[in-house]
Amino acid sequence: MHTSNITFGKTGSQIKVIPVDEVSLEARAASLATRSIKTNSKRAALHLSIRCMDLTTLEGADTPEKVASLCQKAKRPDPSNHDVPSVAAVCIYPEMVHYAVKATEGTNVKVASVAGAFPSGLSTIEARIADIADAVKRGADEIDIVLNRSAFLAGDEQRAFEEIVASKDACGEAHLKVILEVGELGSYDKIRQASMLAMTAGADFIKTSTGKIPQASSLPRVLCMAEAVRDFAYQTNISVGIKAAGGIRTAKQAWHYLVVIGETLGTEWLNPEMFRIGASGLLNDVLLQ
């Protein structure tokens, strides 16, 4: 298996990219999917799923009232049970950030905003940076941008890298999540390379999907990203978070992702600072368990 070194940026940041053994990756993902949550651990797993959740609404019909309702649910997922924790964050469009900041004031719920020509990323870098800066100015704690897949898949990794660096600078104190849109990358090797590129450029989190295409998150894809996070940490001593999003609707699916992250990265990643699940309908299913 050939290992390649890829250099990005003016400073010559270099990362090692190891080709992915597709058969082994999918076999390991299938094996991890057979793991079950023990009865005495079920409650803890449910609460962890909620604590790591980014409760999301990214629709053209979003209104201030809808966002306020989402924030109320984020703060108190089950008003009848005070033991149920709040979610990690709400994820919304920049136009709705002000309302979310107001609705979550005085709580631990973060406000995450998509930005940078989400979900395609196909606008000028100047327009994307302005979009990020606007979301930060409105009060966003976290910014979710998309990898420039057009540049990346055309072989212009340097451009994709530099755009993430510029986006990170525009975030200021806000954390940056880079969405790879794994369903458009075409192979596990590309997912791994994109993961390493985004982390080297300064991403605080790498994220699977926008949730706007059918081919979204899957256990093998998240495992591929988690292995990249593990190897990046080994090479650089920098720990980067990971967010699974797109098509995650059941508690059982969420548990599978917790197992993949825990087994690959260790328990230090099993917290909202290092792992997130982006979802709109998942919370209801978790509360029914």
Question: Residue locations for each model-derived region?
Answer:
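Alpha/beta enzyme core
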Residues: 40-48, 61-85, 95-242, 249-280, ...
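A short, histidine- and acid-enriched strand-loop-helix "catalytic/donor-clamping" loop
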Residues: 58
